[in-house]
Amino acid sequence: MLLAIDAGNTNIVFALVDGGAIVARWRIATDARRTADEYAVWLHQLLQLEGHDRSVIEAVIIATVVPRALHNLEVLASKYFGVEALVAGRPPVEWGITLDVDEPQNVGADRAVNVIAAHKRHPGDLILIDFGTATTFDVVDYSGAYKGGIIAPGINLSLDALVAAAAKLPRIAIEAPETSTVIGRTTQDQMLIGIYFGYVAMIEGLVARMKAEIGRPATVIATGGLATLFERHVKLFDSIEPDLTIQGLGIMYDRLKTGP
């Protein structure tokens, strides 16, 4: 099986992929100080819970936006699985897509991998929205070329900034409100409405502007760890695919094995 690793700013997702299907997935908080040995102990226990031995892992592929975490993940692959980790965007794991932007070298690995997965699954023009530490909007044309996008603070970052700057505001949990009312009657309700429905308005407004700029119908795909948070109140998503990055890593690995 393939061990696909998506190392983000907040969490690292490890997934077992077999024949394109995700067999198991686990999530751990990102900590660049965590050693290969610590990852190995954690993974060994989870593999056992799923009824697997570490010998089932035949290859490892990594996409990361946290450079300091990469070394120990590579050591994990070599020391405990006996393989050299493949790293998305680093030879021989080329993107296989056109990054049609002014600074292609600065496109995040997770965003490029998402483009690969989404284009294979959905022909035509696409808008990808990845809800994570940052909220990113990416435009992909019908040929599969990445045309650019938007980077905004993630919803939890916005809450953190608000609470840090306003001494009397309490820490609240971000969740989808039960109703669509935007007139809160308590401080906590008003904060949740402001953060949550402010994000809903941002999503709807930016997608409308992007569609107008594209000038053609575009499929809107939501992904990332927080994508389902907006499912109740955002009606413009054509598809919610939380595992898009892992699926993209699987596609890249298969392409490397079999050729384009």
UniProtKB/Swiss-Prot annotation:
It is found in: Cytoplasm. SUPFAM superfamilies: Actin-like ATPase domain (SSF53067). K(+) binds at D130. Its main location: cytoplasm. It comes from the Bacteria. InterPro entries: ATPase_NBD (IPR043129), Type_III_PanK (IPR004619). The keyword Lipid biosynthesis does not apply. CDD domains: ASKHA_NBD_PanK-III. GO terms for cellular component: cytoplasm. One of its GO terms (molecular function) is pantothenate kinase activity. A monovalent cation. Ammonium or potassium. Keywords: ATP-binding, Coenzyme A biosynthesis, Cytoplasm, Kinase, Metal-binding, Nucleotide-binding, Potassium, Transferase. Substrate binds at G108, A109, D110, R111, T187. Pathway: Cofactor biosynthesis; coenzyme A biosynthesis; CoA from (R)-pantothenate: step 1/5. Its EC number is 2.7.1.33. GO terms for biological process: coenzyme A biosynthetic process. It is an enzyme of class 2 (transferase). The active site is at D110 (proton acceptor). Homodimer. PANTHER family: TYPE III PANTOTHENATE KINASE. HAMAP family: Pantothen_kinase_3 (MF_01274). Belongs to the type III pantothenate kinase family. Catalyzes the phosphorylation of pantothenate (Pan), the first step in CoA biosynthesis. This is Type III pantothenate kinase. It comes from Rhizorhabdus wittichii (strain DSM 6014 / CCUG 31198 / JCM 15750 / NBRC 105917 / EY 4224 / RW1) (Sphingomonas wittichii).
